[in-house]
């Protein structure tokens, strides 16, 4: 009986233990179910998250592709920009070199312009001086031409007077010869024609007076002839001097005209240089 009781107690204890274990198992099963449900929820959540991540990954990959494409475009743009920057740097360097050369050319052109301006001023002053000298030379040439005309006129007048004096002298000489012939004829007839002595004497005296007058006239004519000859020589000398002066002045005028042509050529060359310098500055 005791054994049965013990066995009953043992069985009861086992039942209690089994019940406890059953309860524990149930609890564990509920806990396991809860954990399973939670795990399923977490799995579903993870699946959703994975799906979301996959979607995000797809979007990210798509975005990455777009970004990579944009990056490639930007890299190409960067390379192009770098090439453009390099080209711009080269162009800037070339422009700086051109600027330096332009500044040098500008300085040279400025110096040439200053020299040309100075040369133009000097040429203008020289031109005015040459014009004044030309005017003065023209006035001197006019005066010398007038003197030459006057000298030629005096020479012509002297020639005319010389011809007239020579003609008159020839007439006087002819009269003297005739008077001498008459005197000789009178003297030869004195012996034969004593009755005509008085008449012949009077004629002789008249002839002597005429001869004396003729001699005086001849002396006067000779003096005048010498004076005219002297004046003629002086006129010829003045004419020769005037001609030499005219030739000298003509040479001086030719030289001045040559200098004026040279100055005009220089002025033209300076003007061409200035035009070229302005064109270079504009370019």
UniProtKB/Swiss-Prot annotation:
Residues 1-283 form a coiled coil. Gene3D superfamilies: 1.20.5.170, 1.20.5.340. It comes from the Eukaryota. Keywords: Coiled coil, Repeat. The keyword Translocase does not apply. The keyword Coiled coil applies. Pfam families: Tropomyosin (PF00261). Belongs to the tropomyosin family. Tropomyosin, in association with the troponin complex, plays a central role in the calcium dependent regulation of muscle contraction. The molecule is in a coiled coil structure that is formed by 2 polypeptide chains. The sequence exhibits a prominent seven-residues periodicity. Homodimer. This is Tropomyosin. It comes from Locusta migratoria.
């Amino acid at each position: 009986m005791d054994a049965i009781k013990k066995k009953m107690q043992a069985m009861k204890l086992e039942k209690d233990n089994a019940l406890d274990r059953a309860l524990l198992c149930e609890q564990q099963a509920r806990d396991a179910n809860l954990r399973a449900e939670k795990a399923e929820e977490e799995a579903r959540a993870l699946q959703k998250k994975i799906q979301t991540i996959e979607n995000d990954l797809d979007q990210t990959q798509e975005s990455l592709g777009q970004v990579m494409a944009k990056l490639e475009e930007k890299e190409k743009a960067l390379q192009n920009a770098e090439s453009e920057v390099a080209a711009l740097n080269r162009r800037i360097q070339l422009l700086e070199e051109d600027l330096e050369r332009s500044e040098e050319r500008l300085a040279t052109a400025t110096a040439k312009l200053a020299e040309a301006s100075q040369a133009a001023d000097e040429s203008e002053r020289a031109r005015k001086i040459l014009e004044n000298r030309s005017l003065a030379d023209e006035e001197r040439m006019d005066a010398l031409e007038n003197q030459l005309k006057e000298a030629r006129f005096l020479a012509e007048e002297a020639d005319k007077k010389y011809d007239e004096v020579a003609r008159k002298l020839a007439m006087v000489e002819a009269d003297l010869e005739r008077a001498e012939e008459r005197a000789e004829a009178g003297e030869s007839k004195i012996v034969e024609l004593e009755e005509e002595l008085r008449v012949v004497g009077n004629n002789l005296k008249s002839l002597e007076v005429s001869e004396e007058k003729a001699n005086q006239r001849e002396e006067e004519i000779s003096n005048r002839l010498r004076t005219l000859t002297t004046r003629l020589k002086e006129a010829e000398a003045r004419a020769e001097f005037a001609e030499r002066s005219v030739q000298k002045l003509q040479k001086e005028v030719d030289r001045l005209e040559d200098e004026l042509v040279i100055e005009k050529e220089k002025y033209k060359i300076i003007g061409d240089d200035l035009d070229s310098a302005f064109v270079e500055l504009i370019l």
